[in-house]
Curated annotation (Swiss-Prot):
Pfam families: ATG5_HBR, ATG5_UblA, ATG5_UblB. Belongs to the ATG5 family. The keyword Membrane applies. This is Autophagy protein 5. One of its GO terms (cellular component) is Atg12-Atg5-Atg16 complex. Keywords: Autophagy, Isopeptide bond, Membrane, Protein transport, Transport, Ubl conjugation. The lineage of its organism: Eukaryota, Fungi, Dikarya, Ascomycota, Saccharomycotina.
Length: 278
């Protein structure tokens, strides 16, 4: 295919893609800021420990490490089990495309009054002994479940990941957290024995609608969007653009979803597509 050359180099660039984020915390009507750069294909809980350490310097009434924190954008809790880049494309990129002067993504950190369990997955595990929230344990459980789901779609069975040795399972998790591309690729190949169908999730910016479906590996991106989002993918809806990993992939409409998945899949082996109306 002409549009996707130098696959390894492109994958490396995607792996190293990052987003500038400004985290705000309102403490007694005083706004405290924290700036960071976070990889697109990582997850927000990986930076929770450093947020807690920083903001604890300004809080004396509570131990932040012992209460679950969460992040919000425009008062909407962020689903932390989604990759950072997917959240960015779905929630923030549409506004940025219309106003290039918006700057970095600004979101708020919360720790009270009540964790919004009706919107986002709660953190129920705690570290033994000191009562601190164990964010990594919960994230491990959720991401491994997502990998099992994608493994089932890809292989027609979840056996490849279920049959990983304990050592390989732990190494896979460490490669996700440390973002070791080499180790991740080696271990991920053990999960993907065959490619039966492609695990795809389609998000529509500005809408709560999410389309999740196993897709035939031979279908094109255009065929998939026409089938699952016909109102946004018809010729009369030419202003709807598909974004993957922050990139407008309109030029790849006639490529097979398998080729696109091989290039753009996330750490959980799902292909996340965001439709943005421009």
């Amino acid at each position: 295919m002409n549009d996707i050359d130098n696959l390894a180099e492109i994958k490396k660039k995607l792996w190293n893609g990052s987003i500038n984020v400004k985290i705000l915390l309102n403490i007694e009507d005083q706004i405290i800021e924290y700036l960071l750069t976070i990889p697109r294909n990582s997850y927000f809980p990986t930076v929770f420990p450093q947020l807690i350490r920083y903001f604890q310097n300004f809080i004396t009434t509570i131990e932040l490490s012992k209460v679950p924190i969460w992040l919000e954008f425009e008062e909407v809790p962020l689903k932390w089990n989604l990759p950072v880049g997917v959240l960015y494309d779905y929630l923030y990129l549409p506004a940025l495309l219309n106003d290039h002067d918006l700057g970095c993504w600004t979101i708020s950190m919360k720790y009270e009054p009540v964790y919004p369990i009706e919107y986002i997955i709660p953190f129920n595990e705690k570290l033994a002994g000191d009562g601190q929230i164990d964010y990594m344990k919960t994230m491990n459980r959720i991401l491994m479940n997502q990998l099992k789901q994608s493994c089932f779609v890809l292989n027609g069975t979840a056996k490849p990941i279920m049959q990983l040795s304990e050592a390989n399972t732990n190494q896979l998790w460490k490669s996700l957290i440390s973002r070791n591309l080499g180790d991740f690729n080696v271990l991920n190949k053990k999960i993907i024995k065959t490619i039966d169908r492609i695990p795809v999730k389609i998000y529509i910016a500005g809408s709560p609608i999410v389309v999740q479906a196993p897709i035939s590996k031979d279908q094109t991106l255009q065929e998939i969007l026409s089938l699952h989002t016909p109102n946004l993918s018809s010729s009369s809806s030419s202003m709807s653009h598909p974004y993957i990993q922050g990139i407008d992939v309109t030029s790849l409409m006639n490529q097979s979803i398998r080729e696109i998945w091989q290039l753009f899949k996330h750490l959980d082996n799902f292909l996340y597509i965001t439709l943005i109306i421009l």
